[in-house]
């Protein structure tokens, strides 16, 4: 069964219909049922609970969460895919126990009402909001961001009710199961990768703002500069040699680390590519790209890391949400440079949603130290 076109999925969404979206096999490898929150009814909630069986959640933009005064469920998110749960909610009025389909639909409508204020909701409750990353699936390839993106593109409030699809025996539904589910219920099915691809054809969260030659101790590179429309700041890409989409390209996506890149601090734990080592390796091969991403770490966070240099790396590694943001930004830059296949300077990693950027990791090259 072929996946439906994103254009057709958006049109169904515009008509108030549910759709199925599947993520990458190297991520959750799951499918979620999605519905624009503006179209949520008791019947829709009942169908989701009965047929999909997963946890019914409400995706909201960061701005929307702030307007409702919704705090994160926990101060430090340790979940594998950084799913950003806020505190659970209930409508202040018009509900009884809060768990019925009608009550949950009422809570959703209260949360997405154009004039909604914090007093319209109480906490905790039976609806679980999820805070989407700014930039949507171009920043993080998750169902949370996909829900907000689809609703926005269909002309609704950028918010969706979503639920994971489970099999009768309680196991997670995978692609073959999801295809049968979609056929049984007459629901269109698509992929987050295709949604990323669709958005990239019309919009980006980064924009190229400059290009020039840059002489370095490792040779002359072409320096490309990019403005980040979401996070602010400037990212750079240093390119040597001729880049062709069909040829595997040596690539390092590097987040600026003042402690390591400027003063040469050495961390406890497995060695990884420094900025200078990556530039030297590219120069030795005569062809490759080093993407240098701005570090949005606060001054306070940087100061707190200094005493931890001798501690295990897990004590100061970046959050999963930050990593996904960096992957999305770096992938957009690589796509802009015309790269299709990567020889990745770094340990083997699985990046969610890379297929949506038409990128394929052919090889991972660990640091030789």
UniProtKB/Swiss-Prot annotation:
What cofactors does the UniProt entry give for this protein? Answer: Mg(2+); Mn(2+)
- Which intervals of the chain are annotated as region DHBP synthase? 1-201
Region annotation (GTP cyclohydrolase II-like) ranges: 202-369
A GO CC term assigned to this protein in UniProt: cytosol
Tell me the Gene Ontology biological-process terms attached to this UniProt entry.
riboflavin biosynthetic process
Q: In which pathway does it act?
A: Cofactor biosynthesis; riboflavin biosynthesis; 2-hydroxy-3-oxobutyl phosphate from D-ribulose 5-phosphate: step 1/1
Q: How is the cofactor bound?
A: Binds 2 divalent metal cations per subunit. Magnesium or manganese.
Site location (Essential for catalytic activity): 126, 164
Q: Which UniProt keywords apply?
A: Lyase, Magnesium, Manganese, Metal-binding, Riboflavin biosynthesis
- EC assignment: the record states 4.1.99.12
Residues binding Mg(2+) 2: 28, 143
Instruction: Give the first-level EC class, as a single word.
Output: lyase
Protein family: In the N-terminal section; belongs to the DHBP synthase family. In the C-terminal section; belongs to the GTP cyclohydrolase II family.
Instruction: Spell out the PANTHER family in the cross-references.
Output: 3,4-DIHYDROXY-2-BUTANONE 4-PHOSPHATE SYNTHASE, GTP CYCLOHYDROLASE II-RELATED
Q: What is this protein called?
A: 3,4-dihydroxy-2-butanone 4-phosphate synthase
Specify the species: Pseudomonas syringae pv. tomato (strain ATCC BAA-871 / DC3000)
The organism's taxonomy opens as: Bacteria, Pseudomonadati, Pseudomonadota, Gammaproteobacteria, Pseudomonadales
What gene name does this entry carry? ribB
